[in-house]
Amino acid sequence: MEICIVCGARPNFIKVAPLIRAIDKSEKEGHDIHCSLVYTGTETDPTLEASLFSDLELRKPDVCLGVDCENLNELTGRVMSLFEHYLSHRKTDIVVVVAALASTMAAAIVTKKQGIKLAHIAAGTRSFDISMPKEINRLVIDGLSDILFTAGMSNNFIANREGAELSKVYMVGNTLIDNLRFMHGKWQDPSPLEGLRLQEGGYMLFTLNRKALIADTEGLHAMVNAVAKAATGMPVVAPLRGLARKAVEEALEPELKGVFHIVEPVGYLEFGWLAAHAAGVITDSGNVAEEATFNGVPCLTLNDYTEHIETVKVGTNELVGEDPEKITAAIDAIRNNKWKKAQIPDRWDGRSAERILQVLVAGN
């Protein structure tokens, strides 16, 4: 059985690593199964630090398509052309894509045009905002997929409501959590590297990636200064790069700059330590919010929505948007130990990749 797994960005590798480890293990045990790992980006992508693959105990991509462009339509077309060429020269029984990037959608379209079975990890996630490119990608990928692997019952409900047959939807849990369980005891304290001398539960972790928020000068100014004021006396550790770093530095009021400790992005094991030991997490990332729920760490999501609703319903996540009053109230609640009680969502047991592999093998 030949499986092709496609990644379009750094977070994708983290989500597919457990599945690739499971497939490689099965192959070594003598089973007739093999997977190739395709990255749509370039070999020199600065977000793919060498330590990422060693940290995840994951081999590097077998093939890099080399697509690197800002225009999403151009990116989609180039990935489609190059991935079609790849598939036409390699026997493939099933293609597995993850999440909802433009590159992921491009690979999904080509897969079906080639008559190859398609599986989607993290299916059934929705923001219900069709103006967002990722929402369009999700609808297309789920609509094309032969197998939908969901992380929770709410995702199952969405997929079924949109017409997916019950027989092709599988609630397998969250592969991101498989990694967190796999990495237990392996996190590395990054504070000596930055001279921060952080204490467990004595700092806030801040991440920012959303381009629309970074570009909103007025909104960003109000948001980051609300964070800094509410967290005064407690360092806010912010691993940021590029435009996000520049925007936050410029938005902070001079008297509050000392609250934020803006550092270069850290490796996977170092970030895992920061996320697990923070008093609270402030982020616009759904993946980081999922980590916070697993770790039992309070989380403020800088959006008015989340595709990962379990983190709000039963987890530690709260949606505060960019509202300074909500942000202030939430940080006050964290500092006064008044955060809501939370639980680990169903099937966050570290066996998601195992379930996915069972389905893939059974359906071959």
Where on the chain are the PLM-derived regions?
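N-terminal beta-loop-helix "entrance" segment that forms/cooperates
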Residues: 42-59
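A nucleotide-sugar donor-handling region in carbohydrate enzymes
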Residues: 42-47, 66, 144-217, 320
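Leloir-type glycosyltransferase catalytic cores
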Residues: 154, 318-364
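Active-site and donor-binding regions of nucleotide-sugar-utilizing enzymes
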Residues: 4-7, 12-24, 28-30, 52, ...
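Short internal beta-strands
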Residues: 35-42, 236-242
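A donor-sugar binding/catalytic signature common to diverse glycosyltransferases
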Residues: 97-98, 109, 120-121, 148, ...
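Donor-nucleotide binding loops and adjacent catalytic segments primarily
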Residues: 50-52, 188-277
